[in-house]
């Protein structure tokens, strides 16, 4: 291909033939160029040319297939320029149009179209829209459940009882749909479902020991125990080096021996593992006087390590090994009946869904792969799957099968490739290229294991199965490459990442960046890590996680804006940052379009970042991939469509009224509402319109009457039009008839808004091709699309060369490159929410349910669930590791990272602890403990000489630092440093005003009397001014409890300033203790309250996150909290939680009461004076149709005085009950006080 200079490895990948070849192509190694060159050389081989249509080239996306076809066409054209008479080249250019350069779905579609008769398929079938599929599924699942209810099948009834809430059966329906969707990513879904159910049909413990569940659980426990061994060995090392800690040594050595024994037992079955773990004991450490220890810091380090090991062993015993092996077996056996019934339900749904699609003659994308498999596969006499005659034809026809982005293949695609290729024959012909370190689509059921299995078994030199590694990176500067290599050698392993990042995997510099010889030019530079510490200047603990995340974005956005401005302008030394121009080969000043900001997810991040950068005058664009249905123009049109379909809907009607289409003012809408409050808005509009026509009602303005008449006439006209017009035509008609299309074009971002409206029109056109028709179905279609998170994303109106900073997700950046990359949000925790589902599923391990005893209303995780949970966590974190790799390797010349932590000192202590266990690398068990990208990065940097700032600032010991080639710049930022001080500065500067006499003429007597009258005025309702407009329930309760009170004193602000020298800390007051307990009950995870150990663990987590003070942690008794969850009320809450029902905690409310309820000494003239009552309801929930209210109390109370206690708080609970009724429309049936002092519930009613 021209004069390209290929490396030896690239050349080998291009020229190697007659084998299955796996090319492991690292980021920026030129894999696409290699793939294209290989194809060109195959079709232009002088001795044995192959026609291009005899190659099957499988790509990941349609865009990639189009790009591949274009590249091949360009290459052939260039060859033709050198050899214009070549008939072979002319032939290949002609054949290119029918070449099999395609996605797997497109290939499957071609196979089906050419062989439809073999599967009894109507040849006029069409591919259904994704949302059309959702609508059909919804129809089928509703019909299926209705039939099952009519059959009164006890097995189905039990499923409903287990998985559904008291309100509806949506949880079970969603489970059936999710499980169906999951299985369709496998080649044989029916077989997988049946085998997954039968896996629970186990009779003996030795059968359970042989399952994959036990194997995976043993592997994961082994990793954890290995980490605990390293931790205790570190503690022993510190103890041996610290004078005075000798008394700890015996305990540590004994505990280490216990854990090593448990480690060795992991391969000996469940009984051995359970017994070994249960025998691990931690004796009380001997006390040591402070003056006997040479280094108190070392003593604290040893204690903390030991406490962490104890906590880890406790977690194993409370989760995976919470019951003995025999009970584990019984729980598996007990789950079999309902799992079998669930699978039967999924299979019946699958059959009905397939039948419904056949009736409508449509296929979905899953059908393409599975019907293709049906055509390509057959069975031998022993019922083994073999290639069909059609597949055999493909084997003979295709000279070579080339698979791009092989790391993203799934099991279905792998099976199809195996059937149409000679992969397993004597003359293999499959070429696979990809980079498993960039496999980031597991959520689409991609299987990186397929790549890894071949990578570990294929030979590097010869044989029928070979591999070649392309390790040279032609994209990035050395600073980027060295930095990426350093981090991933530290943290990527077979455990987290599913691949060891060895020297073989490391990137090698391949790009030629010319030397900078200009003193006024800055190029490259170290990778920057900016860590924001939120613990400084923090006055309020942010309780709203979404708002806290937005606050983090704002802080990081300010750092990003600051650095962009610095990079784009000259420094104090008159130097300017430059990047290498690809075309000229010379350094040029940085442009905004050279910069990208990468995010793990754009939700809650892109908008605040846009605002921050825009405020600093930085042109910026965010491709969020969402927000389409939230745009004002789309919301308005959808509301208009809803009104046309059914005008008896107040919210859409008001939306249209307030829009430019109708132009009603807020006052006019208010007038319409007051016509008849119980009517629909549309009825009131029609009433005003008709009264105006009959000249009966003259109380409305002519303008309002005219608007109402126009509204009614327009809606009537549009409703008539909608009956006979296609939905796409009707939508375009609305755009034109209302002039709304032109109106939005004149708004800010008008081009984008019009493009959004065009997308809706095109979506309607696609809808017209579905089996659903009419306006109602289209609205339902849009609602389903929104509900299924199928936001279409705003229209793209940004040109590729627009000079703006781009904000995008890491996934969208894959395959792209940018001179400067900002990687933000690194402190955000990984999303592991999927691990908390009631039932887990895994393609290898099957189903992982809870064992549920319906009679006792009790549930516990099964061995299967614990095993799958461990496996899913490893796989999820491995995926996150690869996503971080993709993000870092997008940078060509500069990489800048930002992340926020709640408390830098605590985070640094954790990072340094992880880094200190193993000098060679971060232990996989420590990597597994990482909760964010920032954890992984900073653990690694703690061992780097440039990360010494971490150990110097927060270190507990002297770490041996690595002299690695990578260069880093670690910076710390306090929250206060980034808060906008503009307002403060203005207030401090102030402005001086000179007072002058405007008019000094003498006043007359009349004026004097008027002024005196005004100044002497006495307010007739002075008594009401003594009462605040707001009052809390607690104050009101206290007011009713006091016979003698001073109203003014009760509601006047009380400020008691105690001098610091008189402030004496005497522990928490009863009120402070109560506040702490209430906070814990608000935050506690109901899934982890089965033991005091689990509750203690949660309390420590709240302390570590700084939600609890150390004093509060000491006074909260986990045993008393456990007692609550073992009470009848607690059991009801856990039952609801198990079902996914809503439990309302710490619900603030506001309501109005008469001022006479506050102060009965007021005259009756104040009875209509309203005061806002505010309070917080501790807990309420709906249980079997009844609303139950709980108020937590930590007061001291004597046994036997419960009646007095009830009377004390009765009025308070009455207020709460009224508030709940106003919130829910349902009356409270039962009111309870729960006394943590007595550890009992006290029923009010």
Curated annotation (Swiss-Prot):
Source species, domain of life: Bacteria
Residues bound to ATP: 25-32
Covalent S-S links between cysteines: none
Gene Ontology terms describing biological process: double-strand break repair via homologous recombination
Keywords: ATP-binding, DNA damage, DNA repair, DNA-binding, Exonuclease, Helicase, Hydrolase, Isomerase, Nuclease, Nucleotide-binding
Residue ranges annotated for the UvrD-like helicase ATP-binding domain, each copy included: 4-477
GO molecular function: 3'-5' DNA helicase activity; 3'-5' exonuclease activity; ATP binding; ATP hydrolysis activity; double-stranded DNA binding
Domain UvrD-like helicase C-terminal, first and last residues per copy: 517-815
InterPro entries (UniProt xref): AddA, DNA_helicase_UvrD-like_C, DNA_helicase_UvrD/REP, P-loop_NTPase, PDDEXK-like_dom_sf, PDDEXK_AddAB-type, Restrct_endonuc-II-like, UvrD-like_ATP-bd
Catalytic activity reported: Couples ATP hydrolysis with the unwinding of duplex DNA by translocating in the 3'-5' direction; ATP + H2O = ADP + phosphate + H(+)
Keyword Transferase: no
UniProt cross-references to HAMAP family, sorted A to Z: AddA (MF_01451)
Entries under PANTHER family matching the protein: ATP-DEPENDENT HELICASE_NUCLEASE SUBUNIT A (PTHR11070:SF48), UVRD / RECB / PCRA DNA HELICASE FAMILY MEMBER (PTHR11070)
Quaternary organization: Heterodimer of AddA and AddB/RexB.
Family to which the UniProt record says this protein belongs: Belongs to the helicase family. AddA subfamily.
Protein's UniProt name: ATP-dependent helicase/nuclease subunit A
Taxon lineage: Bacteria, Bacillati, Bacillota, Clostridia, Eubacteriales
Gene name of this polypeptide: addA
């Amino acid at each position: 291909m021209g004069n390209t200079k290929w490396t030896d490895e690239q050349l080998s990948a291009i020229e190697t033939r007659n084998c299955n070849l796996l090319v492991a192509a690292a980021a920026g190694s030129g894999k696409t160029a290699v793939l294209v060159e290989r194809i060109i050389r195959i079709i232009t081989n002088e001795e044995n040319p192959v026609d291009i249509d005899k190659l099957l080239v499988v790509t990941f996306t349609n865009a990639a297939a189009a790009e591949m076809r274009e590249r091949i066409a360009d290459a052939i054209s260039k060859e033709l320029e050198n050899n214009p008479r070549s008939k072979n080249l002319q032939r290949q250019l002609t054949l290119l149009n029918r070449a099999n350069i395609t996605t797997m779905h497109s290939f499957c579609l071609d196979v089906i179209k050419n062989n439809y008769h073999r599967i009894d398929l109507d040849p006029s079938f069409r591919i259904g829209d994704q949302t059309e599929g959702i609508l059909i599924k919804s129809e089928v699942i509703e019909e299926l459940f209705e039939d099952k209810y009519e059959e009164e099948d006890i097995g189905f009834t039990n499923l409903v009882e287990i998985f559904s809430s008291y309100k509806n059966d949506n949880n079970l329906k969603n489970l059936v749909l999710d499980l169906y969707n999951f299985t369709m990513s496998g080649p044989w879904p029916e077989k997988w479902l049946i085998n997954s159910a039968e896996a629970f049909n186990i009779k003996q413990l030795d059968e359970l020991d042989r399952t994959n569940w036990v194997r995976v659980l043993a592997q994961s426990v082994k990793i954890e125990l290995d980490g605990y061994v390293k931790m205790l060995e570190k503690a022993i090392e510190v103890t041996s080096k610290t004078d005075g800690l000798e008394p700890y040594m015996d305990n540590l050595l004994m505990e280490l021996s216990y854990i090593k024994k448990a480690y060795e037992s992991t391969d000996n079955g469940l009984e051995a593992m359970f017994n070994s773990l249960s025998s691990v004991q931690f004796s009380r450490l001997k006390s040591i006087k402070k003056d006997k220890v040479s280094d108190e810091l070392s003593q604290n380090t040893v204690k903390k390590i030991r406490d962490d090991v104890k906590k880890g062993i406790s977690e194993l015993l409370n989760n995976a090994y919470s019951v003995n092996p025999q009970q584990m077996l019984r729980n598996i056996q007990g789950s079999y009946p309902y799992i079998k019934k669930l699978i039967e339900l999924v299979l019946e749904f699958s059959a009905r869904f397939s039948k419904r699609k056949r009736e409508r003659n449509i296929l979905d994308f899953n059908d393409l792969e599975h019907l293709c498999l049906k055509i390509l596969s057959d069975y031998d006499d022993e019922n083994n799957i073999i290639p069909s005659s059609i597949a055999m034809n493909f084997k003979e026809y295709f000279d070579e099968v080339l698979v791009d982005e092989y790391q993203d293949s799934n099991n279905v695609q792998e099976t199809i490739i195996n059937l149409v290729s000679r992969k397993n024959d004597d003359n293999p012909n499959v070429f696979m290229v990809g980079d498993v370190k960039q496999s980031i689509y597991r959520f689409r059921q991609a299987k990186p294991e397929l790549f890894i299995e071949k990578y570990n078994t294929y030979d590097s030199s010869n044989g029928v199965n070979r591999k070649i590694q392309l390790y040279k990176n032609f994209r990035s500067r050395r600073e980027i490459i060295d930095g990426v290599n350093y981090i991933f050698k530290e943290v990527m392993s077979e455990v987290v990442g599913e691949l060891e990042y060895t020297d073989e995997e490391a990137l090698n510099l391949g790009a030629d960046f010319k030397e900078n010889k200009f003193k006024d030019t800055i190029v490259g530079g170290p990778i920057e890590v900016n860590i924001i510490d939120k613990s400084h200047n923090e006055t309020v603990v942010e309780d709203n996680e979404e708002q806290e995340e937005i606050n983090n974005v704002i802080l990081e956005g300010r750092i990003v804006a600051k650095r962009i401005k610095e990079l784009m302008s000259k420094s104090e030394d008159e130097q300017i940052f430059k990047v290498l121009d690809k075309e000229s080969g010379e350094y040029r000043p940085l442009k905004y379009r050279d910069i990208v900001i990468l995010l793990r997810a754009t939700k809650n991040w892109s908008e605040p970042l846009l605002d921050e950068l825009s405020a600093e005058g930085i042109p910026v664009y965010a491709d969020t991939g969402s927000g389409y249905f939230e745009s004002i123009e789309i919301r308005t049109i959808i509301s208009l469509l809803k009104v046309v379909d059914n005008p008896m809907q107040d919210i859409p009607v008001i939306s249209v009224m307030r829009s430019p289409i109708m132009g009603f003012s807020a006052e006019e809408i208010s007038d319409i509402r007051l016509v008849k409050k119980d009517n629909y808005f549309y009825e009131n509009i029609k009433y005003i319109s008709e009264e105006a026509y009959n000249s009966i009602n003259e109380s409305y303005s002519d303008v309002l009457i005219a608007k109402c008449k126009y509204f009614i006439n327009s809606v009537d006209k549009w409703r008539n039009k909608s009956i006979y017009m296609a939905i796409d035509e009707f939508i375009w008609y609305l755009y034109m008839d209302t002039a709304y299309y032109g109106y939005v074009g004149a708004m800010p971002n008008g081009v984008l808004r019009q493009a959004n409206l065009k997308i809706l029109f095109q979506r309607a056109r696609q809808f017209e091709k579905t089996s659903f028709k009419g306006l109602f179905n289209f609205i339902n279609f849009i609602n389903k699309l929104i509900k299924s998170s199928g936001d279409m994303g705003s229209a793209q109106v940004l040109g590729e060369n627009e000079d703006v900073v781009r904000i995008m997700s890491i996934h969208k950046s894959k395959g792209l490159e940018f001179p400067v990359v900002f990687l933000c949000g690194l402190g955000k925790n990984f999303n592991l929410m999927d691990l908390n589902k009631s039932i887990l599923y895994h393609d290898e391990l099957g189903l992982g349910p809870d064992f549920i005893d319906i009679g006792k209303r009790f549930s516990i995780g099964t061995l299967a669930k614990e095993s799958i949970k461990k496996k899913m966590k490893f796989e999820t974190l491995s995926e996150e590791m690869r996503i971080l790799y993709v993000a870092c390797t997008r940078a060509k010349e500069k990489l800048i990272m930002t992340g926020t932590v709640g408390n830098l000192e605590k985070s640094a202590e954790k990072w340094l602890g992880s880094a200190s266990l193993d000098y060679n690398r971060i232990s996989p068990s420590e990597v597994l403990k990482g909760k964010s990208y920032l954890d992984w990065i900073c653990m690694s940097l703690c061992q780097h000489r440039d990360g010494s700032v971490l150990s110097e600032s927060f270190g507990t010991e002297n770490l041996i630092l690595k002299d690695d080639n990578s260069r880093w710049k670690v910076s710390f930022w306090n929250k206060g440093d980034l808060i906008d001080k503009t307002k403060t500065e203005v207030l401090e500067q102030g402005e001086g005003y000179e007072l002058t006499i405007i008019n000094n003429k003498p006043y007359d007597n009349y004026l004097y009397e008027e002024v005196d009258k005004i100044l002497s005025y006495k307010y007739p309702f002075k008594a009401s001014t003594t009462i605040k407009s707001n009052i809390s329930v607690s104050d009101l309760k206290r007011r009713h409890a006091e016979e003698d009170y001073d109203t003014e004193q009760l509601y006047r602000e009380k400020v008691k300033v105690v001098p610091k020298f008189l402030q004496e800390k005497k522990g928490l007051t009863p009120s402070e203790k109560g506040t702490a307990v209430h906070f814990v009950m608000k935050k506690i995870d109901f899934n982890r309250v089965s033991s005091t150990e689990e509750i203690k663990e949660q309390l420590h987590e709240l302390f570590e996150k700084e939600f609890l003070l150390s004093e509060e942690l000491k006074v909260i008794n986990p045993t008393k909290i456990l007692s609550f969850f073992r009470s009848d009320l607690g059991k009801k809450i856990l039952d609801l939680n198990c079902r996914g029902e809503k439990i309302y905690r710490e619900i603030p409310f506001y309501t109005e009461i008469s001022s006479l309820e506050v102060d009965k000494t007021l005259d009756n003239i104040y009875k209509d004076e309203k005061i806002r009552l505010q309070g917080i309801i501790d807990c309420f929930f709906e249980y079997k149709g009844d609303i139950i209210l709980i108020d937590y109390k930590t007061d001291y109370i004597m046994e036997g005085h419960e009646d007095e206690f009830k009377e004390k708080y009765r009025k308070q609970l009455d207020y709460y009950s009224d508030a709940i009724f106003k919130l829910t429309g349902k009356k409270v049936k039962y009111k309870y006080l729960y006394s943590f002092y007595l550890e009992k519930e006290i029923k009010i009613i």
